[in-house]
Amino acid sequence: MRVNNLTPQDLKAYGINDVQDIVYNPSYDTLYQEELNPGLEGYERGVLTNLGAVAVDTGIFTGRSPKDKYIVRDDTTRDTLWWSDKGKGKNDNKPLSQETWQHLKGLVTHQLSGKRLFIVDAFCGANADTRLSVRFITEVAWQAHFVKNMFIRPTDEELVGFKPDFIVMNGAKCTNPQWKEQGLNSENFVAFNLTERIQLIGGTWYGGEMKKGMFSVMNYLLPLKGIASMHCSANVGEKGDVAVFFGLSGTGKTTLSTDPKRRLIGDDEHGWDDDGVFNFEGGCYAKTIKLSKEAEPEIYHAIRRDALLENVTVREDGTVDFDDGSKTENTRVSYPIYHIDNIVKPVSKAGHATKVIFLTADFGVLPPVSRLTANQTQYHFLSGFTAKLAGTERGVTEPTPTFSACFGAAFLTLHPTQYAEVLVKRMQAAGAQAYLVNTGWNGTGKRISIKDTRAIIDAILNGSLDNAETFRLPLFDLAIPTELPGVDTHILDPRNTYASPEQWQEKATALAKLFIENFEKYTDTPAGEALVSAGPKL
């Protein structure tokens, strides 16, 4: 049903001319037929799997390309944005001149002109008061499918008179040959203009650039209104108790929040306002490397017709080899959130969070779980430590220790302390407690099992961890439970997983130094200086 009389003439306002045809808010059936069109070539063409989902290949970009991210520096952003060339903290918000922006915009609009285009109008944000109305324009059917999965799908009534607050023009097939003269990183670009409210994409086919692009925009708009904007998953229990799970890619946000005992609010991006926690998205974007029906049944069963697989190995008979990471470790699937049975309906939002869980994937120093004080909560939120997992960004093939402010520095557009201040206010008002959970490896090099981690999460959510006897871990001064139901007691103290305590001490000292060095960038403010004592002490 075409409920919006969008015509090629309307696209001239964006600089897109002579459009052959517009496929507006296509149905899933239409997208299925378009993606499997035998006349398609290269990365446009999808492959049907035996699970019913279509699989696509995103080319050389199997993750985001943060080094190719730019934001126009103008009167809107000059004094508010967290720029890469100001202050001590490193980030990906590289300034772009108005002149270069116009050049990039010309490249993308030229690429989209004269084509048959897919246009998807959708919402970012489950709260009608603060949601963004976003218009996605692309010439690739599966990219339209991706945003239909990932963003909130408007009703026919909501599409009548839909007025976009933000435009995303995806010109994946075009590149910028003048990048060297313009002082850019490469011929590829992901550029934002917060005055014009437009995102441009060139050279990369990776669907996640559209998803995380809008997250970056929400991260700019909401905290300025006193609303927490969070890189987290969230779910709610039978009694209405809400938990949020912060963490970088691959640390377990999607897996751990998808729990048969609790209803899912969302798996990656949320806001927290006066009414409670709400999802930005209408879908999930789960990692599928080594996915099994036994370990993650809900995610496995979500991979069916209308789901979209990325960069997986599809055998000749249509079966999927989820264990094959030869293309990338960052294999993914996007699916509409209703592919998970146990979700919050009809709107993905709930009350205020009482449990805040920081997920980290560490290499044998941090314990599987610890309970944080108020100051430790701020310290570890600003530190955002994890080992960056292979494949989630271009060029990352080995796990490396990294500090990502607020567990999502790549998507922050304001200074990290602004997110910490808003989160702490929301937590204090709700009486929320924070925990640090290590989903990574122990001293033997063995990854902490999903079974043990799920038992730890259960202990947090049912309150048994708060009542458990604890001991303090040296250097980091973390409160660790002596035992928890369903968890191997031996692993709770990370020192037990080494041949000798001295081996742990050596690795722990090295990690503590990294924490201390990283946190120095926050000590230029009194608030940051006051938090130093909540971190490790040598």
UniProtKB/Swiss-Prot annotation:
InterPro entries: PEP_carboxykinase_ATP (IPR001272), PEP_carboxykinase_C (IPR013035), PEP_carboxykinase_N (IPR008210), PEPCK_ATP_CS (IPR015994). Ca(2+) binds at residues 149, 151. GO terms for molecular function: ATP binding; metal ion binding; phosphoenolpyruvate carboxykinase (ATP) activity. SUPFAM superfamilies: PEP carboxykinase N-terminal domain (SSF68923), PEP carboxykinase-like (SSF53795). Signal peptide: none annotated. The keyword NADP does not apply. It is found in: Cytoplasm. CDD domains: PEPCK_ATP. One of its GO terms (cellular component) is cytosol. Binds 1 Mn(2+) ion per subunit. GO terms for biological process: gluconeogenesis. Its cofactor is Mn(2+). Pfam families: PEPCK_ATP. Its EC number is 4.1.1.49. Substrate binds at residues 64, 206, 212, 332. Keywords: ATP-binding, Calcium, Cytoplasm, Decarboxylase, Gluconeogenesis, Lyase, Manganese, Metal-binding, Nucleotide-binding. Pathway: Carbohydrate biosynthesis; gluconeogenesis. PROSITE patterns: PEPCK_ATP (PS00532). Allosterically activated by calcium. Monomer. Involved in the gluconeogenesis. Catalyzes the conversion of oxaloacetate (OAA) to phosphoenolpyruvate (PEP) through direct phosphoryl transfer between the nucleoside triphosphate and OAA. This is Phosphoenolpyruvate carboxykinase (ATP). The lineage of its organism: Bacteria, Pseudomonadati, Pseudomonadota, Gammaproteobacteria, Enterobacterales.
